[in-house]
Each structure stands twice: as C-alpha cells, then as structure tokens.
Design a protein with these regions (language model features):
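Generic alpha-helical secondary structure signal
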Residues: 2, 36-40, 148-151, 174
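Basic, glycine-enriched DNA-binding surface that flanks or lies within the catalytic cores of DNA
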Residues: 3-97
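Terminal peptide-recognition signature
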Residues: 42, 124, 165
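Phosphate-handling DNA/RNA-contact segment within nucleic-acid enzymes
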Residues: 62-156
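TOPRIM fold recognition
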Residues: 130-191
Length: 191
C-alpha cells in the first residue's frame, strides 16, 4: 500500500472477503473469528472463552513496517479497539476513537454498565458467566475506550434509569467516576 493512499483496508473474512476502505489511515487490518489460540491466551488472563461475544475478533494488522496480532472490537465510529495480548498492557485504538456499544439482547433496557476498555468488559462477562457477579444481566454495555469519549457517554447515559460504573481505581478513573456521578444521579460506582 503506497504512502499516498491514506486508507485503512479492512478485510473481513466473514463477509466474503470484501474490503472496506476507511479514510485517513495507512494500516491494513484483517478480521476473523476468534481463534482457538487467542481463546487460550484469554483464558490465561482469567477470561472464560465461552463468555466472549462474537463481536470480538482475532485481528492481524500492519503498522510501522510490522505485522501485529491480537484481538479487538469495532467502536461506533468504525475504528478498532485493539490489543496484542503478548506485547501490550492495554488496548489502543486504530483509526477513529469512539465508544463501543454492546446492546442488550433483550432490546431496549433501563440500565447500562460502563467499562474503561474492552478487556475490563470481557472480564465482567467472564465473571457474570461464572456466577461470581450478580449485577444486571440484561443491560446495555458501553465501553469508553478513552477519556476523550466521556462527552459521548454522558449524552448516551441520560437515556438510562440506572448506570453502573466499572472504572479503574486510578486517579484518572476516580476523576471520570466523580464527573459522571456529578452529572448523572442514576450512576452507581462499583469499582
């Protein structure tokens, strides 16, 4: 791919190998169903593979003259939240930043859960599946992915009667929690 061609090529093998082009990035990304090897790696992190939704993919991408392998999810702006389980400590965004929304399978619901990143979300799903957590099972899950996305979440959260916050206990996580709780009386901190 030439430097003048500023497109992100997404090759989704599940959709007949058709390529989608997203402007303003020079990366190539290949999506496929989560591989057994990636499921085993997630299990090493304590995540139950049977709890992982189909929206989580095994991903290969090229960047900086290197091919990276990891897992990821798409966000609402078409970007990809990506982590290399062997080489990264936390997920990063490829292309456009945005929240990731996982709506409840029951349709419209009155509660949501907010997570800092998709690895926290996967841990929550694993704990729920194993019966170790008894919070709302039927709720929309929103993954913030980056503190820049806070304003987008604040708008989204106004639609819910109950907002469950699962944010880090870091100083940034505490500021996010306090900001959300000040703006939304329905917010409950579970960190």
């Amino acid at each position: 791919m030439s430097e003048t061609n500023k497109y992100l090529t997404i090759m989704n093998k599940q959709k007949n190998g058709k390529a989608l082009h997203l402007e303003h990035a020079a990366e190539e990304i290949c999506f496929e169903s989560l591989t057994v090897k990636d499921q085993e790696k997630l299990q090493e992190f304590g995540i139950n593979p049977s709890s992982i939704p189909e929206e989580v993919y095994s991903i290969d991408c090229s960047s900086l003259n290197r091919v990276w392998h990891g897992i990821g999810m798409r966000n609402v702006h078409g970007g990809v939240e990506f982590i290399s389980l062997t080489e990264m400590k936390r997920p990063t965004t490829i292309h456009r930043k945005g929240i990731t929304l996982q709506p409840s399978k029951k349709g419209s619901v009155a509660s949501c859960c907010l997570f800092s990143n998709f690895m926290d979300y996967l841990a929550y799903l694993s704990l729920s599946k194993d019966g170790k957590i008894a919070l709302p099972k039927e709720c929309d899950c929103i993954i913030l992915n980056h503190h820049f996305n806070l304003s987008h979440f604040l708008v989204e959260s106004e639609e819910y009667e109950e907002v469950n916050l699962f944010l880090p206990n870091s100083s940034a996580g505490k500021v996010l929690t306090r900001t959300i709780m000040d703006r939304n009386p329905a917010a409950v901190d579970w960190s």
